């Protein structure tokens, strides 16, 4: 569970965790504060084996169906590391150096939260401020869906493999 209320989170970053905060991301504003469940959907895909089909965060006061049923297509995000994250923006920015001369991420954070966990067991919750998952078949462009209530986002989903994909 991500506890957005304790930290006053109202913005989230949807991004490959190896990207700086200026590259191929989707920054979402007006996110409802509160507790969020972190969810992944896995399925078996032939010779590929079991893969993460989608990842999502969902406010504990709400429900929605996986795989963009009723969600708003809010854009796409790129993956180059085989992983995806949904994180508090301030938490994400803290671990990603972003200026003209330097563009790098906090290697200790990356190794602890991405390499050691997400790559080994398909997902990881980082300090209750971020959710990291492996990304289906790996690198590519993926759809981001949002679910709203009274003008505030209460759910975010990244779909790596749709039900129609037959890879």
Outline where the language-model segments fall.
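Intrinsically disordered, low-complexity acidic regions enriched in Pro/Ser/Thr
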Residues: 1-167
């Amino acid at each position: 569970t991500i506890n957005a209320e304790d930290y006053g989170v109202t913005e989230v970053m949807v991004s490959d965790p190896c990207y700086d905060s200026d590259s191929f991301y989707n920054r979402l504003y007006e996110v409802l504060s509160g507790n969020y469940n972190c969810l992944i959907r896995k399925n078996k895909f032939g010779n590929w084996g079991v893969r993460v089909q989608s990842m999502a965060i969902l406010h504990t006061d709400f429900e929605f169906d996986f795989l963009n049923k009723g969600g708003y297509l809010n854009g796409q995000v790129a993956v180059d590391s085989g992983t995806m994250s949904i994180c508090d923006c301030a938490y994400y920015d803290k671990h990603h150096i972003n200026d003209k001369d330097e563009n790098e991420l906090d290697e200790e954070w990356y190794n602890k939260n991405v390499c050691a966990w997400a790559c080994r067991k398909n997902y990881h919750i980082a300090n209750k401020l971020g959710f990291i998952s492996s990304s289906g078949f790996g690198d590519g462009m993926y759809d981001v869906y949002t679910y709203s209530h009274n003008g505030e986002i209460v759910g975010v989903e990244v779909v790596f493999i749709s039900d129609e994909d037959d890879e």
